[in-house]
Swiss-Prot record:
GO terms for cellular component: cytoplasm. Belongs to the methyltransferase superfamily. RsmC family. Pfam families: MTS, MTS_N. This is Ribosomal RNA small subunit methyltransferase C. It is found in: Cytoplasm. It is an enzyme of class 2 (transferase). The keyword Oxidoreductase does not apply. Specifically methylates the guanine in position 1207 of 16S rRNA in the 30S particle. Monomer. Gene3D superfamilies: Vaccinia Virus protein VP39. The gene is rsmC. SUPFAM superfamilies: S-adenosyl-L-methionine-dependent methyltransferases. InterPro entries: Mtase_sm_N, RsmC/RlmG, SAM-dependent_MTases_sf, Small_mtfrase_dom.
Length: 326
């Protein structure tokens, strides 16, 4: 009998480091496209890019290590799925930083798993789990259904603005009126897909391209577009990394401000800086962000002028034209 153990690492694996262990056959699951691309050629483990891990991979794993995400609901969604497929001979461990929210694990999972704390070090905690009851996992029970302006919005746990449509997106949508003449749109960080779906209700002939680095967001966008009979090209991309078309009339985004709970303005700067490479001659970029974010610095660097189209108590919508590029 082979002594090689099949190990599956899943959950929030973006910053997880896997030391080389010859007697371990490791598979790592990620929802992050950048993480997937960076590790495709890693000889220490096979990388999987999907919303959830394939059933057979879970069932063939001797050990599962779940890295706790920042969203409690995302953890419940993924763990519910995993333990619904496990046998009692399989081992499952949970690892997370003190700041991730992992300390709620015993209350969150007590119906299905006996949780035991094994160790804590370097601001992280490690737990083991013994399954006492296998849940019946129903994917559709975790899809959040929202409705706004007759648009059906469907969102998977872990995707931005799961419970409702955020005010920034609403403000950005309010600047998009019927008198504008857009034929091609790039929606960066598409999330639930509500922004592109709204544009399709105003411009029925519009050609939509939706990108996100998170596969759960891409799946949410597919669900939203399908529910509203809207067509669009949806694919993973780390900002512009996977975008090949370079003639968009509009680049639109409600970009993330945090990476792993830390403020990070590099994404916004990248979107603004490189937008000119992907805009048509009459194209424009529109971005919504919090009022206190120094977005104007990037626009000043890369455009001769820009416009603040709209403001609210918390948000600003910025706009700049390709013709005004530096």
């Amino acid at each position: 009998m082979s002594s090689t153990k099949n190990v599956l690492i899943t959950g929030n694996t973006i910053n997880f480091y896997m030391p080389n262990r010859p007697k371990l056959k490791v598979k790592m699951h990620t929802q992050c496209f950048n993480n997937f691309k960076n590790n495709q050629k890693n000889s220490m483990f096979a990388i999987i890019f999907d919303v959830l891990v394939n059933k057979k991979i879970i069932q063939n794993s001797d050990v599962i290590i779940y890295i706790w995400p920042n969203s409690k609901l995302e953890a419940l969604f993924q763990i519910n799925y995993i333990i619904s497929l496990l046998s009692k001979t399989q081992k499952i461990f949970f690892l997370g930083s003190n700041r991730s929210g992992i300390k709620c694990i015993q209350n969150l999972l007590k119906k299905w798993i006996i949780i035991t704390k094994i160790d804590s070090s370097n601001h992280c905690i490690l737990y083991s789990g013994i399954i006492v009851l296998k849940p019946i996992f129903l994917y559709e029970n975790f899809i959040k259904f929202n409705k706004w302006n007759n648009i059906v919005v469907k969102t998977i746990p872990g995707v931005f603005s799961y419970n409702n449509i955020d005010h920034g997106t609403k403000l950005l949508m309010s600047t998009c009126t019927k008198n504008l003449r857009w034929k091609t749109v790039l929606d960066i960080g598409c999330g639930s897909g509500v922004l592109s779906t709204y544009l399709a209700t105003i411009f029925p002939e519009i050609k939509l391209t939706l990108i996100d680095s998170n596969i759960a967001a891409l799946e949410s966008s597919k669900l939203t577009l399908t529910s509203n009979n809207v067509c669009g090209e949806i694919f993973p991309s780390n900002i512009y990394s996977n975008v090949h078309y370079q003639n968009f009339d509009l680049i639109i985004s409600n970009p993330p401000l945090h990476v792993e709970n830390k403020l990070n303005f590099s994404i916004i700067d990248n979107i603004i800086k490189n937008s000119v490479k992907y805009l048509s001659n009459k194209g424009e970029i529109r971005i919504v962000t919090l009022k206190n974010v120094p977005c104007h610095k990037s626009f000043t660097l890369y455009f001769k002028k820009y416009t603040i189209l709209k403001t609210s108590s918390h948000y600003k919508v910025y706009q700049a034209n390709y013709k005004d590029r530096v």
